[in-house]
């Protein structure tokens, strides 16, 4: 439960950082970022596995790069659920944001969270 809550907060922080750097992404507040992160995590648990299974041949041919497209789809779904509180202006922006989210989440996970768990 604590790991999940930390993941929600890390994703919310990353969404806020991405909002600051990419003009095509708009998050209205910190609370909206936390709610968007919560919705995104729910979609990642419920919808993302189905998308991965249905697109497995494409994902294999692209050597896993299609997973960024799947992440972009879940980001766009999150934005459509959130309405005006979280907006992404295009699918290309969503792909770019999914790449940034994935890279930074991996860096935070491997560089900060895992070493803290080992102590």
Curated annotation (Swiss-Prot):
Family matches, as InterPro entries: Phage_holin_4_2 (IPR007165)
Record membrane topology: Multi-pass membrane protein
Gene Ontology terms: cellular component: plasma membrane
Residues making up the signal peptide according to the UniProt record: 1-23
Location in the cell: Cell membrane
TM regions (residue ranges): 27-47, 50-70, 88-108
Organism: Bacillus subtilis (strain 168)
Protein name: Uncharacterized membrane protein YvlD
Main location: membrane
Pfam families: Phage_holin_4_2
Swiss-Prot/TrEMBL keywords: Cell membrane, Membrane, Signal, Transmembrane, Transmembrane helix
């Amino acid at each position: 439960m604590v790991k999940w809550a930390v993941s929600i907060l890390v994703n919310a922080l990353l969404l806020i950082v991405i909002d600051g750097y990419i003009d095509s992404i708009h998050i209205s507040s910190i609370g909206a970022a936390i709610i968007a992160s919560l919705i995104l995590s729910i979609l990642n648990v419920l919808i993302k596995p189905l998308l991965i299974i249905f697109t497995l041949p494409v994902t294999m041919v692209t050597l896993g790069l299609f997973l960024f497209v799947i992440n972009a789809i879940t980001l766009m779904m999150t934005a459509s659920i959130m309405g005006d509180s979280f907006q992404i202006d295009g699918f290309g922006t969503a792909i770019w944001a999914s790449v940034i989210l994935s890279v930074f989440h991996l860096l935070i996970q491997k560089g900060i969270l895992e070493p803290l768990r080992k102590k």
